[in-house]
Each structure stands twice: as structure tokens, then as C-alpha cells.
Amino acid sequence: GPHLHFEVRATDSQKPLNPLLYGLPVNDRQRPQIQKLILYYPQQNSVLTPSKRLTLQKVNDSTYQTPLIMTSGKIGLGIQMFDRQDLSYNRNGIYQAIMEVNGKKVVNYKFDTLNYSDSDKLFVIVDYPKFKNERYKVVKLFFQNQKPLTFIKSMVNEGMIDIVIGKSYQIKLTLKDFSGNSTHVEMYVEGKKKEIKAKPLDGKLIEPHLEYFFPLDDQDVFIPKNTFFEDAVIEIKKEGNILSIGPNLFPFDNPYEIRFKTNKQDSLQLRQTFIAKKTDKKDYYLPTVLKDGFWVSQVAEMGDYKLARDSVPPEIKAYNFKPEQWLSKFKFLNIKISDDISGIKNYRGTINGKWVLFEYEPKRNLLTYDFSDNDFDLTKHDLRVEVEDNVGNKTIYETVFFRK
């Protein structure tokens, strides 16, 4: 629901700053915790980066080791991790991550300031397939073919380590929180010949600097330049009235466009029709416009899409009162509203013909009016609530209540 965030920002740039830099007292004796350590094999001709999870062996309270790694070629590392403070179970991010190879610093992430322009690019350093398909977040300590983010203080060779056959390497990871608590991982790598095979993907290679148009009878897909951060492979299929686009393995920089050709229908049917994302549970409304004989929607995710229609108006019900009830002792007036197909677009409430503020809580489908907002001279009050869904269907609820 609605809530408030406080931020400390630099006056000149408006960049968010780490508030702990300004002496806020926080009790913290807990070390950052590592949940998973992932070894990646970045390859020149592979769109998807092969990876494997490494076993972590606890040496003491602050140090872990991995078994000896024997491989060759370029490797990178990724970590699933979190940090806690005393007296709190919240899982926070860490303050600093450092990677050293043979005693030399290769990567240094430090979260003392952020840039809002970074927020759209954070999925570049997150293992996107694992996040979308396995629901956990691994932060990669390598960063290919991209402009550095604000919190990347230093990075050598894009954070990748080139393992040469016959040579040995010591890799040390250090995770720190702001209070100085730290956790370490020690790794030893021996250069041995090893062939890493990338998983092949079916579909069309999409290069970020090009645009693509895919016509499919009465459905089209348009992918502008810079839709993806990096090269992607996508497969587009038309299965009956379903437009299927996948796989869900690549992060988006910008949305792309899907189009469904309009049929000869009356104006009401046209207005009530929209593009929906199809899931196992339900069809989800997507903002849709009519353009040049097509229904058009901008999307920034893979999935199955179809045309849907919503001819059912929203529902409105009294929640904590009954019509013609005395409400003199009530502090709030609650109205339940819902629309199971395209969803609520807007609402408006009046009492005795005068607009009043209703606060909307979408998770509970609840409108709430605070009686302390207004004083009324009369005892009989006419309530009117109008709700409109995303395709323009409307419902009006009118009733009377009494209050001194």
C-alpha cells in the first residue's frame, strides 16, 4: 500500500547518498551472508553465459573456501548474498564487494551513492535467467560491453579472469557492510584444458543496434533499436489466436511493440477489446491503443499474448455499512470495488453532490473516506460513487446514510 521513503540526496546533483555516511547510529555486529557462489564462463560467440554453482566450505565464522577449480579460458563470478543489522530480520544489500586475483584488486563495488540512470540497467549485473525463472538474485562481478554503473569503483578486464593452462590463481572475495563486518571466500584455480559448451537456443538473433519487424498474418511484432542491453535470441510463434514470444532469458532496456489486426466490429466491441498477457491463472490487461487498424501494446517482457474483451462493468458494494444506516459514530466509510477483467482505471465519490476524497487500497480493493475531512450541516446524506474500468465500462453506486 501507500508508504513513504526518506532519502539523503546531494543538493547539486540530486543523487541518492548512503545515509549511513552521515553518522546515523545503527547497531550492527552481523557479517554479510553468502547464499550461493556461481562460476560463469563468458564466451565470445555465446548469447547465454554457461554457469555452475560452486560448493562453499566454511573455514571459520568469517571465511569460506571452494574445492580446487580446474578450468581454462575466461571466467567470472556471481554471488547471491544479503546483510542484516542487529535487532532486525530485514535482508539488506551489502555495502562493498571486492574481488582480488593473486593479490591484485580486479573488482570493487561500493554503494556510497547511486544514480537514477543506473536503476534501469541493474539487470545487466544480475543473472537475469536465474532471477526470472528460478526466483533468486545473483549479482555478477563482471560487466560485459556496458558503460560502468555509479557503484562500480574499479573493474579490470570487465571483471573477467583469463585462466591460462599451466598457471595457478588465488581468488579472494571480500564482502563488507558499512559497520566493517566482513565475509571472505578463498578460491584456488588451476589452469587445465576444459571445453565448455554453451546451450544452443532456437530463434532469431537480435542485435541491440538494429531494429526488427516480424509480420505474422494478423499479428506483428516490432523490436526497435536498443530494446535489449545485449545480444538476445528470441522465438516468435503464432499458435491460433495466441502470440507467443520467448524465451524469458534476456533483460530489456526498452519496450517493444506487439500488434493485433482489428476485425470488423461495432464501436462498443472495439472499445472493450484489449491485448492481454495470458498466464495459467488469468489474462492480464495491457494498456492498448487503436492505431492504423491494429490494437497496439508496448511490452517489456516475454510471454503469451492474446486479444481479450471486457464487457462486464466494475462491481461496487458497501463494505462497513448498510443503506440508510446511522453512521454518527463511524470514523470511516468503506466501499468495496472490483473489476476482474481489465481492472480499475479511475473512481470518483461525492456526498450531497460535493466531491470528497476516497483513498484507494488496491490490494484490498477498498475505497476509504475519512469523516473528519468534512463537516456536514444536514443529517441525511446522498452518497454517489462512480467507478470506471480500463476499457471504459462504468458502474454507479448511489445510496443514503444518516449522520449528525
Description of each model-found segment:
Residues 18, 104-109, 241-244, 280-289, ...:
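Surface-exposed loop/edge segments in extracytoplasmic proteins
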Residues 42-45, 52-193, 340-404:
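Long, low-complexity serine/threonine/glycine- and acidic-rich segments characteristic of extracellular
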Residues 223, 247-305, 346-348, 355-357:
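Proteolytic-maturation and junctional protease-sensitive modules
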Residues 1-43, 48:
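Conserved, short, structured surface segments that act as functional micro-motifs
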Residues 196-209, 230-274:
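Proteolytic processing hotspots in large secreted/extracellular or virion-associated proteins
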Residues 31-36, 313-320:
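Proline-enriched interdomain boundary motifs that mark the N-terminal boundary
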Residues 60, 67-72, 250-251, 323-329:
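Short, solvent-exposed loop/linker segments at the N-terminal edge
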Residues 78-84, 257-263, 332-340:
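Short edge beta-strand/loop segments characteristic of extracellular beta-sandwich folds
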